[in-house]
Amino acid sequence: MATKAEMETSMGTIVLELFPEDAPKTVDNFTKLAGEGYYDGLIFHRVIPDFMIQGGCPQGTGTGGPGYTFEDEQNAHNVDRGKLAMANAGPNTNGSQFFIVTAADCNWLKGKHTVFGEVVEGMDIVDAISNVDRDGRDMPHEPVTMTVRIVEG
């Protein structure tokens, strides 16, 4: 049974298949936070067309996290369109922030960010979020919120 996450956003639903075999600590962390309701009501605080959408910061600024960090998990997954990866502030600084890639290829990020899932439904929603009006810091003018639930199968 595959582990999936349903990310209900204010713009529609994104379904993600997670990669527990390739990034076990990262998937455990994401599923734990989701199960605790950590992501519920948070926003995508950084959206860049043809690059990615980023969320998971409790402050909504890109500066916050869960109060701890954990190490990177390198794997064979490319950082390309539809991939779910951890955002960080450098090596081994993963917490709660993540991004979903909208560009065809971002492999210059490979080895710098742990890939731990991919979009299996709702890539059109990801693209729509990445193209909302935003300010000079790439924050949407109108907040795009999320709720994350973990489902099996």
Can you describe what each PLM-predicted range is?
Residues M1-G153:
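Cyclophilin-like peptidyl-prolyl cis-trans isomerases
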